């Protein structure tokens, strides 16, 4: 019993650490166009993408992401048929909550000091977020911060220079083996007073690679190998997948 109480206390401490990182938290309000700077509705608009459930799978190791992710900002025509993403002031437009990694470091849920929280982060600049409003696909480079008293505050899977590159589509994928094609879909469309909402979209991706861990263990990489062993990293393209159920709102401020 004492070990379980200690485990709960450590979870609380880790959550406080995660908040202290300054991670931009996903919003429960939908749609949320806070920070959208669109003024010319002919060439600009607001977007809010919030996930309802998600799974990130690395060689069979599954991490449920829950309702932890959001992309929010302004879309502007680039004059060549594409769209430029601008985040709300003071943010990068990508918002995430910390989620627990099943089994923690050692694969034993209740073991004191074992709990690991994962925070998905944008890897690089907001300009690298590419959104297609025709098919609701999203291209985005990410990295995942792992937070644990042993791992330290700088442990990451992926970096700005070597990210996990996701192309989340609503169509059918064409992955390298051993993965096989999977399909997403565009959800139901409805109107609201400031625009349109698509609910229940499914975006999928299973052609990406996942690099090994970096800076785990006091920021010195002392236990990168332990993290890689636990999460089966690095993992080549064709062994990983991500599926997200989300709602998308497009409109005016």
Where does each model-flagged region fall?
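Extracytosolic secretory-pathway proteins
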Residues: 27-253
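Secretory targeting and sorting signals
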Residues: 1-28
């Amino acid at each position: 019993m004492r070990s379980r109480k200690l485990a709960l206390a450590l979870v609380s401490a880790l959550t406080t650490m995660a908040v202290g990182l300054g991670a931009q938290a996903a919003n429960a309000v939908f749609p949320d166009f806070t920070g959208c700077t669109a003024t010319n509705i002919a060439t600009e608009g607001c977007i809010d993408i919030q996930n309802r459930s998600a799974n990130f799978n690395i060689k069979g190791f599954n991490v449920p992401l829950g309702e932890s992710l959001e992309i929010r900002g302004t879309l502007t025509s680039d004059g060549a048929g594409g769209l430029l993403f601008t985040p709300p002031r003071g943010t990068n437009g990508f918002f995430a909550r910390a989620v627990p990694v099943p089994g923690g470091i050692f694969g034993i849920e209740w073991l004191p000091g074992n709990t690991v929280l994962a925070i998905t982060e944008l890897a690089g600049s907001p300009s690298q977020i590419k959104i297609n409003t025709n098919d609701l696909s999203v291209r985005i480079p990410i990295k995942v911060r792992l937070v644990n008293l042993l791992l330290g505050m700088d442990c990451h899977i992926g970096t700005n220079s070597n990210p996990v590159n996701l192309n989340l589509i609503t169509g059918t994928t064409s992955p390298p083996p051993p993965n096989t094609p999977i399909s997403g879909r565009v959800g139901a469309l409805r109107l609201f007073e400031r625009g349109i909402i698509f609910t229940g979209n499914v975006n999928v991706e299973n052609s990406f690679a996942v690099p090994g861990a970096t800076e785990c263990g006091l920021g010195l990489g002392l236990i990168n190998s332990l993290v890689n062993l636990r999460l089966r990293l690095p993992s080549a393209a064709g062994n990983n997948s991500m599926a997200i159920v989300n709602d998308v709102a497009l409109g005016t401020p």
